[in-house]
Regions:
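Residues at alpha-helix caps and immediate loop-helix transition turns in enzyme cores, especially N-
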Residues: 27, 58-59, 120, 186, ...
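DPxDG-like acidic metal-binding loop motif
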Residues: 25-32
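Ordered, soluble secondary-structure elements with a strong preference for glycine-centered loop motifs
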Residues: 17-18, 118, 180-185
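Residue-level signal for short amphipathic helical patches enriched in basic/charged
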Residues: 26, 54, 178
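Histidine/acidic-residue-rich, glycine-tolerant segments that coordinate divalent metal ions
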Residues: 4-16, 22-23, 35, 41-164
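Metal-dependent amide/peptide-bond hydrolase catalytic core
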Residues: 126-227
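Acidic-leg catalytic submotif of subtilisin-like serine proteases
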Residues: 1
Length: 227
């Protein structure tokens, strides 16, 4: 259960306020209240509370369900919190403002067995660890230091036990890029590394690379209005 001392602490076991989405909802509600009380503007404002901001693809679902047919919207202004910035400060610019997000998942199938007999096994923990270290060289050795790209391995799960060498494992991770060229290069290198490790260790390696969101690009006119 959440151990925060704030007034809005979660009362549900296993659920806490740990990401910015709760803040986004509160911020938009505050903006709606402010503008509703002070209607000193022309036109109409529609406040869009996007569900499932990230992997739920909430924006896409809202569009498919007829958001723009129900409301006449000519421009959209979105915002995202930025912890560490001074209170009241807004940061924006024309062009690319947020990175894309791609997810990768790699499945390794070797041969499990007793921990006392590694020579007759295909230990996917050792092989997967080798692959993870290779993945870390993509950003540091294949892309420009100024690219702003990030590759993070975030999960490494196997079917092994304390005295049993794993026969299968899954590696998952997240990739952020500022342009499609870097994203394509990273995807291609992950593919080559998976093929190489499979050949070297004579195991089966399958992988997927899915781009959830492309880069956020700010248009000139709306950005000028904000500034």
């Amino acid at each position: 259960k959440e151990k925060s001392i704030h007034d809005y602490v979660s009362n549900s076991v296993g659920i806490m306020h740990a990401c910015g989405h709760d803040g986004h909802m509160a911020m938009l509600m505050g903006a709606a209240q402010k503008l509703s009380l002070d209607r000193n503007f022309d036109g109409r404002i529609v406040f869009i509370f996007q569900p499932n901001e990230e992997h739920g693809l909430g924006a896409q679902a809202m569009i498919e369900e007829g958001l723009f047919e129900k409301f006449s919207i000519s421009e959209i202004y979105a915002f995202h919190n930025l912890p560490g910035s001074p209170l009241g400060e807004v940061s924006t610019r024309v062009g690319q403002i947020c990175s894309s997000e791609s997810l990768f998942e790699i499945e390794l199938n070797g041969i499990g067995g007793h921990s006392s007999m590694p020579h007759v096994c295909k230990d996917v923990i050792a092989i997967g660890s080798e692959l993870i270290m290779s993945l870390q060289t993509i950003i540091s050795r294949k892309l420009s230091p100024g690219s702003g790209a990030v590759l993070s391995v975030t999960e490494f799960i196997s079917d092994g036990q304390r005295n049993i060498l794993a026969g299968s494992a899954v590696i998952k991770g997240d990739v952020r890029t500022k342009n499609s060229a870097d994203r394509d290069l990273i995807e291609n290198l992950i593919d080559k590394m998976c093929q190489g490790i499979a050949t070297e260790h004579e195991i089966e390696v399958n992988h997927i690379f899915n781009t959830e969101f492309i880069e956020t690009i700010n248009a000139q006119v709306p950005t000028d209005i904000v500034i």
